[in-house]
Amino acid sequence: DNYGGVRVDGTNATIIGTKPGEFIADRNHITRVWMDHGMWPLLTTAFYIDQTGDLSILLEKAPYFKDAQIIRGTAKDANWNETQGCWQRDAQGDIVQGSILEHILVQHLTAFYEVGEHNHMRLRDADWNDALDMANECGESVAFTAAYAGNLRTLAELLAALEQRMHVQEVELLAELEPLWKQASAVYENIAAKQMSLNEYCRSCSHQVSGRRKKVAIKIIADKLTHMSEWIMNHIRETEWIEDKNQGWFNSYYDNHARAVEGHFDSGVRMMLTGQVFAIMSSTAQEEQIRQIVKAADAYLYDAKAGGYRLNTDFHERKDDLGRMFGFAYGHKENGAVFSHMTTMYANALYQRGFAREGYKALHTLYEQAANFEVSRIYPGIPEYFNDRGRGMYHYL
């Protein structure tokens, strides 16, 4: 049921309905595309497979969501109406059923080609940080580009396991997908060509798909995904690393003027935690870089009194070309509060890469803050974030 909310253009319905497998396009009929949404389902699916060994789930079938939104939320399908239902159909009028693997590929291949002028994935209406919502035209999320790179490698590994353990040699994929997975690697450097490839794919399935499928060797797909992953990681390493004495970190975003958000500015150092988390988790960050990131995070983001690692340093600017978060007072909400979810992912990433002491520090500081009732003022548990005074906020989340 959970993959039934994915559109064939790689975007997804954003609201879960009242029944299993029921989805609603968006809240209040406001079309928004969060560029990170395609990344999370694979994490959950891979976790399930790790826990159960059930690789066969990748071959199970699910429909695709269909509504008026097409071409990744940038146009409307004039040939669609609600009487046609909410499932994608083919040229024969049949509901399209694709494997879970195919759904995941659709999400990741479309994301790979939707890039901005620095060849990172476009931020669109936001990513995990909902408050980065004012850079739709030129914004890019380097942070989640790294996250997708890690996923592409994970998916390649799952495909290899599917071949080795279940002896599956081929998979059937939508014929329309072929130009995306088959593209020559030289195109990866060509921003205009990538954008054109994505646009052609989206237009080929804007109202319906042909219904044709092609069998593809698993090894070919796995090799392509591995190469895509490696290309992204190398690109980020070469273009987004910020040097700072014996420490450093990765730039996480580009704003709506296509400018790098982090680094050394007249107003001070600008650093965000999100880009470091996914660079580490995805293995984009190499071991020595992780050591330098930890030093920088301790120097610029760590505040024990606030509960640990803040989401960002104080930019001393209301950046209306990036998001509403800069309209909040520093230390509140997304503007520099200690966000429990991102801190936990920072710890998770560090543990995954063998930096156990550093990961423990992040988690333990969260625990100490939450357990200190005189300051946190919450019942036992973890709040959404700790504000500038160290108080736990939105505990019910």
Predicted regions: what they are:
Residues 1-397:
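Acidic, mature catalytic/reactive cores of soluble proteins
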